């Protein structure tokens, strides 16, 4: 909680966040994501995960959640058993363009609502 508080300067950008104290099983187990879905009250079919680590990717995929892998600044060799359907170098915005390394192509130069909606609907 202290890290989140420091990173966001005590501003309340999130309704909740989940730490290792909140779940019995940590990533790569799907429990952290499933708990987030439950607490949020949204449907699992309206969810999407952005991840940058092997444990997080395994966790999201085990929870059967549409997952976009965003490359980290840290050198990571992705596990071959993780079914990566989308890998990008950055989420992007109008000043920082997104490059799709693997996955559906963009209609714009960054990930937008339309892309996310199509990705969720075509995930299975």
Residue ranges and their predicted role:
Residues 1-124:
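Asp-based, Mg2+/Mn2+-dependent phosphohydrolase catalytic module
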């Amino acid at each position: 909680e202290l890290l989140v508080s420091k990173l966001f300067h005590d501003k309340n950008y999130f309704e909740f966040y989940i730490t290792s104290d909140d779940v019995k099983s940590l990533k790569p187990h799907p429990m952290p994501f499933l708990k987030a879905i439950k607490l949020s009250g949204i449907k699992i079919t309206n969810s999407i995960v952005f991840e940058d680590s092997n444990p997080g990717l395994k966790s999201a995929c085990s929870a059967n959640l549409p997952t976009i892998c965003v490359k980290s600044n840290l050198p990571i060799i992705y596990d071959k058993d993780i079914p990566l359907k989308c890998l990008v170098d950055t989420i992007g915005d109008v000043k920082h363009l997104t490059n799709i390394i693997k996955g559906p192509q963009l209609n714009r130069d960054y990930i937008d609502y339309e892309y996310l909606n199509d990705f969720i609907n075509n995930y299975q």
